A protein has these predicted regions:
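Class I (Rossmann-like) S-adenosyl-L-methionine-dependent methyltransferase catalytic domain
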Residues: 1-35, 42, 48-100, 114-121, ...
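A conserved beta-strand element that flanks and buttresses the S-adenosyl-L-methionine
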Residues: 106
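Short catalytic micro-motifs in class I SAM-dependent methyltransferases
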Residues: 109-110
Length: 206
């Protein structure tokens, strides 16, 4: 099955596959670029919307896209339930187009679906659509010879090399870079991931 088919199936029920608690990393992004009138956020690969809705609750104007119709449907439903508005729509990380500029852009658990031939263009696009002094947060799964592939790993996902992520946006100010190994239960089987994370700030002279 394709990635779209898999995620559509996971998201079709009333329960939220990833839960509704926002990622802890969002508080770090809020601290680095606090909300104020007119500040915009882009969530690339928003899933069922838990992070996008949280940022809307914080007061940002939020734009969020995902590959799945079910994910966007549940994002809109969660926003309505929480009493906030956002702009949620179906799009693809490999081909998305936006005419906005954003104060915060983040993508978690999605960049591994970038095709290799699209990586350079993707990061060029991020440079173009991030406002001066804006923040970008990205994490990627990293290949390690001593770790097995996760049981729910999709054939369309691409492992990154250790440190590869840090070579993109290299002229930006790094607020945080790290690599961690952690245990996960996705797919119902305990396993380990290695993940690289970058938080960087676009300098005002770009």
């Amino acid at each position: 099955m394709s990635i779209r088919t898999n995620y559509e199936k996971w998201y079709e029920g009333d329960d939220y596959y990833w839960g509704i608690e926002p990622g802890s990393f969002l508080n770090e992004l809020v601290d680095l670029n606090p909300p104020s009138a007119g500040k915009k956020v882009l969530d690339i690969g928003c899933g069922e919307g838990k992070d996008a809705v949280y940022m809307a609750q914080k007061g940002y104007e939020v734009f969020a896209f995902d590959l799945t119709e079910n994910g966007i449907r549940k994002t809109i439903a969660l926003a309505k339930n929480r009493g906030v508005k956002l702009n949620a729509y179906v799009d693809d990380i490999n081909t998305f187009v936006t005419h906005e500029q954003y104060d915060i852009i983040y993508s978690t658990g999605t960049v591994q679906y970038l095709f290799d031939e699209n990586k350079i263009e993707f990061f060029k696009k991020l440079e173009k659509i991030t406002k001066p002094n804006g923040i970008v947060y990205i994490n990627v799964f990293v290949e390690k010879s001593f770790l097995e592939l996760p049981p729910d790993w999709d054939r369309e996902e691409k492992m990154w090399k250790s440190g590869e992520l840090f070579t993109y946006l290299a002229d930006w100010k790094f607020e945080r870079i790290d690599e961690v190994i952690f245990e996960d239960q996705s797919g119902g089987v305990p396993h380990y991931h290695c993940m690289d994370t970058i938080i960087c700030r676009k300098q005002s002279n770009f």
